[in-house]
């Protein structure tokens, strides 16, 4: 809808490639929400990579229910990058962190995606018109979840231990290709 070039951060992160990236003036970072913030691997990568040509940045975060006070940390990241912070927007999408939460069934997932369309249109309109996103909710709960809970949640809860192979594995290797941390490998095609 915005007709702009895309950069696959997963490929860059997986390859540990923090070389400079030629960008347009406007950068739109679309990322999942991990524990009420952007994933640490994404913020770490952004902290190291130079965005040549970038002047403004919008953060678009998909989430299962909420992004907490991620905007505070995104604003700080933008300041460190010397970019004009244009806001943080959330798009509620089907839960996909299956190690901890249940994914919705197909019908419920379709309904969640359909319900997200007005938010997506609003986000596109803001970016297209060079406008800041409206400030997201920021209450005590949001600040607590993104602040005190995030580091504990990431250290104690967000682990790969819950991901194991089963007889359903067909040995296609897709999980190996997609894992940005390179911590999945096939052993005897499983």
How should these model regions be labeled?
Residues 149-173:
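Charge-patterned, long linear interaction tracts outside catalytic cores
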Residues 2-3, 159-161, 189:
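Generic structural motif recognizing short loop/turn segments at the entrances and edges of beta-strands
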Residues 164-165, 170, 174-190:
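Iron-sulfur cluster-binding cysteine motifs and their immediate structural context
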């Amino acid at each position: 809808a915005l007709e702009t070039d895309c950069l696959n951060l997963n490929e860059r992160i997986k390859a540990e490639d923090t070389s400079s990236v030629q960008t347009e003036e406007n950068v739109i970072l679309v990322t999942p929400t991990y524990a009420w913030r952007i994933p640490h691997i994404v913020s770490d990568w952004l902290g190291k990579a130079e965005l040549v040509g970038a002047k403004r940045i919008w953060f678009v975060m998909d989430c299962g229910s909420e992004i907490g006070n991620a905007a505070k940390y995104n604003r700080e990241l933008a300041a460190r990058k010397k970019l004009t912070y244009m806001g943080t927007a959330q798009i509620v999408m089907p839960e996909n962190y299956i190690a901890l939460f249940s994914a919705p069934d197909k019908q419920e997932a379709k309904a969640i995606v359909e319900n997200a369309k007005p938010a997506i249109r609003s986000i596109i309109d803001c970016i297209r018109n060079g406008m800041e996103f409206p400030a997201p909710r920021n209450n005590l709960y949001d600040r607590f979840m993104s602040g005190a809970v995030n580091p504990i949640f990431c250290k104690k809860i967000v682990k790969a231990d819950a991901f194991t192979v089963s007889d359903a594995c067909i040995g296609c290797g897709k999980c190996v290709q997609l894992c940005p941390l390179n911590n999945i490998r096939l052993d005897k095609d499983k």
